[in-house]
């Protein structure tokens, strides 16, 4: 069977599934199965594939039809300017989370020397993206999941940043190491009752630990803010990602913990997404 025939077949199969982009998904999965890029598929559409490649593709296709996210199938996800290793133990990076990277780079110039803490680091993509852009920055990432920390360490190795970053398997409550110029965090902030309303791909496959914000969505956020107030240097900056409907309550929590609010950022969908504040 040739490449084009396989893609046509896959497009029909995924078209009847939860996939929102069956054609693109089919191309990505076939590229993965034969270890070629998508351009190769277009230029060699009549190429006959060997049985091993077809079998590998069919296996990936079945998993995608069941709703498993593309990032978990191909073990990678592009974030900021790099590809990061991703598996089922970490949340798949979202484009809106790039706001944390973008704002950090705006706040601190190339020559700044900075010590950064990333609370709930997951794959490490936020912290490592920042370090990749700034040679004088050093980072520490913590996560309650040991498996997530292993992913973050692997990504640091891939991007040759292991000499400028340390990762610790620790709950935010128990972490007491260091003082920081900047704290960044994308903590779990979804209410428990809303987890069942998430898209199928997210609900069934992404780690609940990285999504569940407790009964009211604030249990993890409150802990992160409290710990940040202890670990952040005076006049240090804090960049926090949040749910679209959480701004008012978080602003109050920040003020009670002696933070000055610099600004609230909206995501690409025009929803409130990040708060930048300063420890006073």
What do these predicted ranges mean?
Residues 1-34, 41-42, 46:
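Non-catalytic accessory regions of SAM-dependent methyltransferases
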Residues 14, 108, 156, 228, ...:
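Conserved hydrophobic residues forming the short capping helix/wall of the S-adenosyl-L-methionine
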Residues 98-197, 223:
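Conserved SAM/SAH cofactor-binding pocket of Class I
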Residues 161, 206, 231-234:
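Helix-to-beta-strand junctions that scaffold the AdoMet/dcAdoMet cofactor pocket
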Residues 215-278:
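Conserved Class I SAM-dependent methyltransferase catalytic core
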């Amino acid at each position: 069977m040739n490449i084009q025939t396989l893609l046509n077949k896959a497009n029909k199969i995924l078209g009847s599934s939860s996939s929102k982009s069956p054609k693109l998904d089919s191309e990505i999965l076939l590229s993965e199965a034969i270890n070629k890029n998508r351009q190769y598929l277009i230029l060699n559409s009549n190429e006959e594939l060997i049985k091993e490649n077809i079998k590998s593709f069919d296996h990936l296709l079945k998993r995608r039809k069941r709703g498993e996210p593309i990032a978990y199938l191909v073990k990678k996800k592009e974030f900021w300017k790099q590809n990061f290793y991703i598996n089922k133990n970490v949340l798949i990076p979202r484009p809106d989370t790039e706001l944390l990277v973008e704002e950090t780079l705006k706040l601190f110039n190339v020559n700044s020397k900075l010590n950064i803490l990333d609370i709930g680091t997951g794959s490490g993509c936020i912290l490592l993206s920042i370090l990749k852009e700034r040679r004088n920055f050093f980072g520490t990432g913590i996560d309650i999941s040991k498996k997530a920390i292993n992913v973050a360490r692997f990504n640091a190795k891939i991007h040759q940043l292991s000499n400028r970053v340390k990762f610790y398997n620790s709950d935010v409550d128990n972490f007491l190491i260091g003082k920081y110029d900047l704290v960044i965090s994308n903590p779990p902030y979804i209410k428990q009752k809303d987890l069942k309303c998430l898209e199928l791909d997210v609900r069934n496959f992404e780690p609940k630990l990285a999504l569940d914000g407790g009964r009211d969505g604030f249990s993890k956020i409150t802990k992160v803010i409290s710990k940040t107030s202890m670990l952040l240097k005076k006049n240090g900056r804090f960049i926090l990602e949040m749910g679209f409907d959480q701004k008012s309550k978080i602003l109050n929590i920040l003020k009670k913990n002696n933070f000055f609010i610099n600004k609230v950022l909206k995501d690409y969908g025009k929803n409130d997404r990040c708060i930048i504040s300063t420890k006073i």
